[in-house]
UniProtKB/Swiss-Prot annotation:
Domain comment in the entry: Key residues/motif important for the effector activities are degenerated in most NLPs, including the nlp24 peptide consisting of the conserved region I (11-aa immunogenic part) and conserved region II (the heptapeptide GHRHDWE motif) that is important for phytotoxic activity.
Subcellular compartments: Secreted
Glycan attachment points: N60
Species this protein is from: Phytophthora capsici
Motif extent (Hepta-peptide GHRHDWE motif II): 202-208
Name assigned to this protein: NLP effector protein 9
Residue ranges, compositional bias (Polar residues): 55-65
A Pfam family that the UniProt record links to this protein: NPP1
Keyword Glycoprotein: yes
Signal peptide: 1-19
């Protein structure tokens, strides 16, 4: 009986074990066919975070240069492009301010050399340059240098020609011309260091001038229509001039004092001397400023801007 009971218990145990094994295999098969549930959004998927989402870069490939055909001509070298050169902005010209007179000894003033005439007016001025005969008194001297230095003149002492018988540097005649009522007027001016009929009389500095009136400077043979020499703030007039008072195209005047009256110009038959001619527009800038600014005591520069037109109007001979 005991043996039978033992065998029965063994068979029951084996049946139980076999049933459990079968149940486990069936459950395993069901689990493999069911998908793994996705974790909730609140959890981070480490696998996704570690996975690279940027596509892999394609590695650089070195392209071998193409060998140039030796028969092909070389391309022309392009011209270089240069930046334009900018002109510097000129500095504003400073105001020179008022002219300060620079006086020097009358016998140290150097004249301007007579330039070659270029314009019609310059050629006419040279063509009709007058002669001056010094009857008594000073000879003409330069009045201004290139740098604007001006003659200091002479005191009225000694003989009328004392200290002024001529400059070792050479002398000068100053010219300026323009149209006046259809007639071409050429003014020729001389400077004298003093105007003294005798010692103690007269004044330091003197300016005298003659105006030659012609029909037209721009024709082959211009004609002298009149001559007006200056005399004591006025003029003597010859319309037309006497043939004896003209040498070719050069009128003749004399500088003379009839005591006790000061010196003046008048037409003459006597020949005289000539000087280097410098026209107004040929003077240096400093010389122009000096001539327009300097006061000459009792004498007046006739061809400066302040006097030129008024002198022409007063000397009008027609």
């Amino acid at each position: 009986m005991r043996l039978f009971a033992f065998l029965w218990s063994s068979v029951a145990f084996l049946s139980t074990v076999q049933a459990q094994v079968s149940q486990t295999a069936s459950q395993t098969q069901d689990d493999s066919s069911t998908p793994t549930p996705t974790p909730p959004d609140k959890y981070v998927n480490i696998a996704d975070a570690l996975r690279t989402k940027t596509p892999m870069a394609t590695p650089n490939r070195t392209i071998m240069p193409t060998r140039q055909d030796p028969r092909a001509p070389e391309p022309p070298t392009p011209e270089p492009t240069y930046l334009p050169t900018l002109s510097p902005t000129p500095a504003p010209t400073p105001d020179p301010g008022p002219w300060v007179a620079k006086w020097m000894d009358h016998d140290q003033v150097q004249p301007f050399k007579q330039p070659d005439p270029v314009t019609v007016s310059e050629k006419a001025a040279v063509k009709f340059k007058p002669q001056i005969h010094i009857t008594n008194g000073c000879h003409p001297y330069p009045a201004v240098t290139w740098w604007g230095e001006t003659s200091g003149g002479l005191k009225t002492k000694g003989a009328p020609s004392a200290g002024c018988k001529g400059s070792g540097w050479g002398s000068q005649v100053y010219g300026r011309s323009t149209w006046v009522k259809g007639v071409w007027a050429i003014m020729y001016s001389w400077y004298f260091p003093k105007d003294s009929p005798s010692t103690g009389l007269g004044h330091r500095h003197d300016w005298e001038h003659v105006i030659v009136w012609i029909d037209n400077p721009d024709i082959e043979n211009p004609k002298i229509l009149a001559v007006t020499p200056s005399a004591h703030s006025g003029y003597s007039k010859q319309v037309p001039p006497s043939a004896d008072c003209v040498d070719g195209t050069s009128v003749k005047v004399k500088y003379e004092s009839k005591w006790p009256i000061n010196h003046a110009l008048e037409s003459t038959t006597e020949g005289g001397e000539t000087q280097d001619l410098i026209m107004w527009n040929q003077l240096s800038e400093n010389a122009l400023r000096a001539m327009n600014s300097v006061t000459w005591g009792d004498a007046n520069c006739p061809f400066c801007d302040g006097n030129f037109q008024a002198k022409l109007d007063k000397a009008w001979p027609f």
